[in-house]
């Protein structure tokens, strides 16, 4: 096949066999967010490039190496969004919905784009669900976000496979003091740092902390600790968060090297990680960004949020075999009709059933075919039952209900009793 007729490397088709699990995951998350009082916002996938340079930071890996940036016909520099927070902040500023201290609890879903090396769990087009809260500056809202994700993991059956890591980055002033101390220490050990860490030391020193290079990790054992440079405000905030997580019974570990890859974070940062997906172990991450709105031209506004990677979480559900049986099965009932008169009757009959059982997944055979071929398609569909409507059934105004998964013998059911019968054996279990 011509390369131009193939998907771009790292940008994947999500095929019909995969979409039921995606819809299950997305539906579970959206219902949970609704229950917690969060409202959905939808932003464009393309923004002015300067938005991400100002928010994420010009010397971050995302801006320097990973963004899909192009000039449009007007000569404007545009970028496919690499993350959602900056675009959400731009939207709330543009429409003034956080003015006057209005609290906004928002969520969004959609594709993000980064030109990274594709591998399991990491793609160039990937999908995220993000949550952002504005004008709440206490540790209680930080805790709510974490408690909410903890509840989600329970709903999905993956709590035992994820671990919460926490850290506090302090205020910008505390972070600047720590940065100076870290640069001084690392500069004295420059020849022991890997090449990438030497580059980061000049551009974004805190990113050296999350290096995977063994020799650099050995140097960092004796490096200054961020916790020793925290201001009282940040320390009190962090203690308040931990107290709330303890009260909620949510286990966590303090990771002093957790800094996140975006410049706008302050105070709380957190990650949910798993050891089930290899190198790409972060499934959800976030933190506070109290200075970002002001940095982008707005008034000082507290902000906190997180994003979760849908591909990784779907992969985790599959790895742990946490795929509900009804999700794996896309059809509940498959109707086989034999003869033109039966096909006409089947159309009216199935629409009556749909009126009474709107959640029933009922598929009608299309394209005619012999009894054997239709029954084969019914079995292949994964349906629990086949409905059989032929000349004899048509004359008697009955329909055959044949179990396909070992639930007993075939029964003949009167047309006017079909909905009630299916409700008892399919919809209710």
From Swiss-Prot:
A GO term, aspect molecular function: histidine-tRNA ligase activity
Alphabetized Pfam families for the sequence: HGTP_anticodon, tRNA-synt_His
EC number: 6.1.1.21
Catalyzed chemical reaction(s): tRNA(His) + L-histidine + ATP = L-histidyl-tRNA(His) + AMP + diphosphate + H(+)
A biological process from GO: histidyl-tRNA aminoacylation
UniProt xrefs under PROSITE patterns: AA_TRNA_LIGASE_II
Superkingdom of source: Bacteria
Keyword set includes Nucleotide-binding: yes
InterPro entries, per the entry: aa-tRNA-synth_II, aa-tRNA-synth_II/BPL/LPL, Anticodon-bd, Anticodon-bd_dom_sf, His-tRNA-ligase, HisRS-like_core, HisRS/HisZ
Entry keyword Ligase: yes
Gene3D superfamilies: Anticodon-binding domain (3.40.50.800), Bira Bifunctional Protein, Domain 2 (3.30.930.10)
Similarity annotation: Belongs to the class-II aminoacyl-tRNA synthetase family.
Quaternary assembly: Homodimer.
Cited PANTHER family: HISTIDINE--TRNA LIGASE, MITOCHONDRIAL-RELATED (PTHR43707:SF1), HISTIDYL-TRNA SYNTHETASE (PTHR43707)
Protein name, entry field: Histidine--tRNA ligase
Organism expressing this protein natively: Pseudomonas syringae pv. tomato (strain ATCC BAA-871 / DC3000)
Lineage: Bacteria, Pseudomonadati, Pseudomonadota, Gammaproteobacteria, Pseudomonadales
Gene that this sequence comes from: hisS
